[in-house]
Amino acid sequence: MRVSYDELKNEFKRVLLDRQLTEELAEECATAFADTTQAGAYSHGVNRFPRFIQQLEQGDIVPNAIPTKVLSLGSIEQWDAHQAIGNLTAKKMMDRAIELASQHGVGVIALRNANHWMRGGSYGWQAAEKGYIGICWTNALAVMPPWGAKECRIGTNPLIIAVPTTPITMVDMSCSMYSYGMLEVHRLAGRQTFVDAGFDDEGNLTRDPSIVEKNRRLLPMGFWKGSGLSIVLDMIATLLSNGESTVAVTEDKNDEYCVSQVFIAIEVDRLIDGKSKDEKLNRIMDYVKTAERSDPTQSVRLPGHEFTTILSDNQANGIPVDERVWAKLKTL
């Protein structure tokens, strides 16, 4: 089924107002979830909203909390989120990173005691839309086994890198082959994953999303490489923010909250003139896109370019929402 942007946003806002959020905060939060869903990140928009409400009701999310700056070192700042709403706080932090980059050429914000930021790509895109390179990542609950283990000891720790091309080029990836949100998308669609997603109970690679959702044996992206990347991203976020690590969140909290996040903006325009920038970036993109196709019916993919098409389609034709997800939203 498809619903209009306003219909979806109004449902989000209704639920938030019922949980005693202020009118202003409910409007801002509902807009963020609707924007994420309309942009095509269904797994971290409408699909994730019931989980957000669960954490709100548990007290993991403190809606009226105000993030505060703890430390300033020129182009680097350390902030404390105080468990405020994750996606709204993340937007503010990337805005601040952009402000610092406009002054220093680069801006780095390290955030502690944060909540799940929903679609991490939103914040890389936010920087790229303003002409900056945007880089951000978060640590997370231990929901993935490190390479060589069965037991979950590392987070999926999503990493986003966005470049101000036309259209925007952006990598938005967890350190696993699939996030749990994308496993849900495949399961709801009644299909297997396109590549191996994890291990079954016997240790064999599997593309069955329901098996991996149940046994939580995600496959790290690039095998040992994704495992290693997850670990170092966790270390850096923990050090820069003086916040909680994956092990601390996993062992000391009763759910995924008080995570650590990093937001980086890099100003490009003072490093290279606009004409040269466009020529160099277009040459890279053209070189990639004109490679001989392995499948003549499938175009060569540049990361993030599909979101421009998805957004246009959803704006014109309504936003796809799984009927089961919509029914659940209506009951909240």
From Swiss-Prot:
The reply on keyword NAD is yes
Q: What is this protein called?
A: 2,3-diketo-L-gulonate reductase
* Protein source organism: Haemophilus influenzae (strain PittGG)
GO CC annotations on file:
cytoplasm
Q: Which NCBIfam families match?
A: PRK13260.1 (NF009750)
On subunit structure and binding partners, the annotation says: Homodimer.
Q: Name the keywords, alphabetized.
A: Cytoplasm, NAD, Oxidoreductase
Family, according to the entry, reads as follows: Belongs to the LDH2/MDH2 oxidoreductase family. DlgD subfamily.
Q: Which domain of life is it from?
A: Bacteria
